[in-house]
Amino acid sequence: MNTTVKQNNRGATNMKKILRFTASWCQPCKGLAMQLEEAQLGLPIEVIDIDVQSEIAMEYGIRSVPTLILMDEHIEMKRMSGMKTKQQLTEWIND
């Protein structure tokens, strides 16, 4: 899935979203995608394939995948890398 980062949520009250940096060859990325789906975090997730959209990965300084970045509008709130459990993801969002 190739999704570009879009900025078309005008009028929305909650501008938080998760950027999920991934690659087709990355096994932990596939596991993390399943954990994210199960966690049902309630935020939009934009998927960025670092091989297809390398300029975006460079812009965000991505050094490894999987990497998640929590954004509030255009501000990076926090990030984490590596495989995580559903519980770790929920704690990360709510922390």
Predicted regions and their residues:
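N-terminal "domain-start" segment that seeds a small globular fold
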Residues: M1-N8, P44
